[in-house]
Every structure is written in C-alpha cells, then in structure tokens.
C-alpha cells in the first residue's frame, strides 16, 4: 500500500530561475535574446560551413556538428524556461520531464565527446599536417561523430531509466527551471543512492576520459609547437587550438561544478546559476569563440555578406 501511495505525482511544478515578479519580464527579454542569438549563431555557422567549399575540412565538419548540438540542447531547455517567466505556475508532466532529461543528457554528453574528438583533430592537424586529410578521412570523421552520439545516448538512457523507476510521493516542486537529475533526486521518496552512484561514476568516468584525451592531445601539440622554429609558425599553430581550448575550459568547468559532487553538497540556487551558463550562455558563445579568432571563418562570412549584398 505504501508503494501505491508513492505514485500520486504525475506532474512537477518548475519554480524557474526566480520568483520575483519584477525581474521576470526583464529576464524573459534577456534570455529570449540569448536564445535567438544562439539559434542564429549556430545555424548560421552550419550554413556558412556548408556553402563555403574552403571550409569542407574535418575541423569544420566537427564544428558544424558541435553547432547543431548546441542549437538542439539549448532548444530542449530554453522554450520551457521562457514560458516560466510569463506564467504564475509552470508545470511539466512526469513523462515530459523524463523526455526533457533524456534529450538534454544525450546532447550535453555528445558535446563533451565531440570536444575531445575535436582536440584529437587539432593534434593530427598540428603534429602531422601533411597526412591530415588522409588521417582524418570523411569515413573516420563520421564514425567519430556517430560514436559520440552513441556514447551520449547510452549515458543518458542509463540515468533516465534509473530515474523513471523511482517513486515520487510529493512534494512535486522542482526548484529549477528544467528537469535536471540532481533536483529530481531530492524529491524522490525512494532510495536514490544507486542513482547518485551512477551519476557520479558515469559523469566522472566520461569527464576524466574525455579530458584525458584533450590533455594528451594538447600536450603533444605543445611539444610540436615548441619544435617549430619560426615565431609566425608557432603563432599560427597555437591560434588553431586557442578557440577550442577556451570552449573546453568553459564547458567542463561549469559541468564539473554541477555533476561531480555528492548530493550533500548540492545547492539549488548555485546550480541554477551554473546551469544558465552551460544550457544557454555556452551554446551562444561557441560560434563567437570559434569565429572571432578564425581568419577563414571571418573571410567566409565576409564573402557571404558581400554575395548577399550583390544579389540584392
């Protein structure tokens, strides 16, 4: 009978980013602009790479995949968050909450894998430039991206399935703006120790594994750069990696703050702030990070604008 009583929660109430009415409209406008810039920047990057033959290289293939993932996973979160600023009480059904968690988990983990793949790509480009196109064949690139998606799916399915088996007796108030697993675990009336263990192990192994690939790749890149005699050559080699290294640092810095910690140290308010960065701000910044210091992207964008102006 106790188990039956623990099946009453069929929907959750999302508290959103703030409950202060005077801030809601301002935040709605702010995050609507951020979301619009995110979509415009990432979809624009994909289109620019597609229409520019010079950018049809492994590096930009991975960048277009990263842009697609950024656009998708911000879209999993942003619409529901924006609605929460306009209504008094924002609710989400249990099944919709589970699906949001599933898709977000797949996409954010895929992004982590893609960043490590891109580090390996930069390693091959700097250390073996003459064999770059041979080593990073189209088939190999597609396999790497496919592997990243499969890895992200396995990770997210593991947590989603274990989460769906929990019982929720109430309260049903999620102190967050989306269905993130730590904020859901504290609402369950079941034993969540296994869920916490899986979250810690999977997040830790994936983070350490992907960061190890990034670290080794950049260590070998640094050694290769030091062997370059000309200052201009060293500068060119470093500039090809600086944008990616910046993106990796921001992405893993925010995610590790949230997920690689026990529930006893979990704070909803600090987690909300950090979550804004990796769900909305980072997807917006990535196109800027990869384009502002990239001469090829800037030239391609300039040509595209000139062609558009000429056609008009």
From Swiss-Prot:
Keywords: Cell membrane, Disulfide bond, G-protein coupled receptor, Glycoprotein, Membrane, Olfaction, Receptor, Sensory transduction, Transducer, Transmembrane, Transmembrane helix. Residues 47-54, 121-133, 218-237, 293-312 are cytoplasmic. The keyword Transit peptide does not apply. Signal peptide: none annotated. The keyword Membrane applies. One of its GO terms (cellular component) is membrane. PROSITE patterns: G_PROTEIN_RECEP_F1_1, G_PROTEIN_RECEP_F1_2. Its main location: membrane. GO terms for molecular function: G protein-coupled receptor activity; olfactory receptor activity. Glycans are attached at residue 5. GO terms for biological process: G protein-coupled receptor signaling pathway; sensory perception of smell. Disulfide bonds join 97-189. InterPro entries: GPCR_Rhodpsn (IPR000276), GPCR_Rhodpsn_7TM (IPR017452), Olfact_rcpt (IPR000725). It is a multi-pass membrane protein. Residues 1-25, 76-99, 155-196, 259-271 are extracellular. The chain crosses the membrane at residues 26-46, 55-75, 100-120, 134-154, 197-217, 238-258, 272-292. It is found in: Cell membrane. Potential odorant receptor. Belongs to the G-protein coupled receptor 1 family. This is Olfactory receptor 5J3. It comes from Mus musculus.
């Amino acid at each position: 009978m106790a188990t039956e009583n623990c099946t009453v929660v069929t929907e959750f109430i999302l508290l959103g980013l703030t409950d202060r009415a005077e801030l809601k409209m301002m935040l709605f406008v702010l995050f609507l602009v951020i979301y619009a810039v995110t979509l415009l920047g990432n979809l624009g990057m994909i289109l620019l790479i597609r229409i520019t033959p010079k950018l049809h290289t492994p590096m930009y293939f991975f960048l277009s995949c990263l842009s697609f993932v950024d656009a998708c996973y911000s879209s999993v979160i942003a619409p529901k968050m924006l609605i929460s600023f306009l209504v008094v009480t924002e609710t989400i059904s249990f099944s919709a909450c589970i699906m949001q968690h599933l898709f977000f988990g797949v996409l954010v983990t895929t992004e982590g894998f893609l960043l490590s793949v891109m580090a390996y790509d930069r390693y091959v480009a700097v250390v073996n430039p003459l064999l770059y196109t041979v080593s990073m064949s189209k088939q190999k690139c597609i396999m790497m991206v496919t592997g990243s998606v499969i890895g992200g799916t396995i990770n997210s399915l593991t947590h989603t399935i274990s989460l769906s088996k929990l019982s929720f007796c109430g309260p049903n108030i999620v102190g967050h703006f989306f269905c993130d697993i730590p904020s859901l675990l504290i609402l369950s009336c079941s034993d969540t120790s296994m869920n916490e263990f899986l979250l810690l192990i999977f997040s830790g192994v994936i983070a350490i594994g992907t960061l190890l690939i990034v670290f080794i790749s950049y260590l070998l890149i640094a050694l290769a750069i030091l062997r370059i005699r000309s200052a201009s050559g060293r500068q060119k080699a470093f500039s090809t990696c600086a944008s990616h290294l910046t993106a990796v640092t921001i992405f893993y810095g925010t995610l590790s703050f949230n997920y690689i910690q026990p529930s006893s140290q979990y704070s909803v308010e600090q987690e909300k702030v950090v979550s804004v960065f990796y769900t909305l701000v980072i997807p917006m910044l990535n196109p800027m990070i990869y384009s502002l210091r990239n001469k090829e992207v800037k030239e391609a964008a300039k040509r595209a604008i000139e062609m558009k102006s000429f056609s008009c």
